[in-house]
Amino acid sequence: MYKRQIERCREILKDETTAILGYGPQGKGQGLNMRDQGFKVIIGLRKGRSWDRALEDGWVEGETLFETEEAASRGTIIQYLLSDAGQIQMWPMVKANLKSSDALYFSHGFGIVFHEHTQIVPPPNVDVILVAPKGSGLTVRTHFQAGRGINSSYAIHQDATGRARDRCIATAFAIGSGHLFETTFEREVHSDLTGERCVLMGMLQGAFLAQYEVLRENGHSPSEAYNETIEEALESLYPLVSEKGMDWMYSNCSTTAQRGALDWAPKFHKALKPVIAECYSSVTSGKEAQISIESNSKADYREKLEQELEAVNNQEMWQAGRQLRPLRPENL
């Protein structure tokens, strides 16, 4: 675990130009934080909506904002923050612009770990490093603005210069990390993909929907089912679990809630662990990567994805949420 020493980071990176390729949530959050802390950072984009957003955020064309290939050629640390599909598409150009002793930086191990599918294999004369914030790009930015920072993992995949660790850790704090813990590219991507499919998103949606449907099938109104399934969890209990831990929550709830949670948690553990183990195996085997890459390469993928997302959007559960969220006290 490392604590931030920002002046030391500035010294390490004083002769570096960080080129951020991509301006999605991570590119934007990391770039703005680096700029605010006085590091030399440029953005590389194709002209379009992301380019316009970058201009609105104060990046200056020809000074700190360049087209992707130009930025790649100017950078000494290339932060490769395009989507997984975008990284595959742009890799030949990026590889051609890597110079000896450059650093290639990722915030996700997908491209490197699943190189058989992505074809992303860096040359041996560059550092290959990773900093993976444990939150969305928006959280990277808002935590930094609040003076908190965000926890991040870091990894060294290839140390061609002997300076990869220093460059990695300095950049981690430059983007707004508060604390760091070491991992590997493999462990990062395996845990990240499993988390997204399970407790962070996939399983969470499934669990919310299952409880909501049971309550509705037994006569509860949409508002009651939503409040007891989602609103209380997200607005009251989960923030306390984050702040104090589940052990504290168990010790500070009603005796009825305490007894029920203690009795039912093992049943959920027994039911869910095999599903999570199946998911983890699918991730580590490369099956999930293959599914993602093959899906993204289909001509009609975007159209079908929009249909899937619209189906979630139209679920009664989330329609109830849209009606109830404006009624929170802070919104009245």
Regions found by a protein language model. Name each.
Residues 105-197:
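Rossmann-fold dinucleotide-binding core
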Residues 29, 35-59:
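NAD(P)-binding Rossmann-fold cofactor-contacting core
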Residues 217-332:
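NAD(P)-dependent Rossmann-like dehydrogenase/reductase catalytic/cofactor-binding core
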Residues 1-2:
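Conserved small/polar residues in nucleotide/adenosyl-binding loops
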Residues 162-217, 223-241:
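Active-site-proximal catalytic alpha-helix in oxidoreductases
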Residues 51, 71-72, 87, 222-226:
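Small-residue helix-packing motif on alpha-helices
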Residues 46, 55-113, 121-136:
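Rossmann-like NAD(P)-binding element
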Residues 16-34:
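Glycine-rich adenosine-cofactor-binding loop
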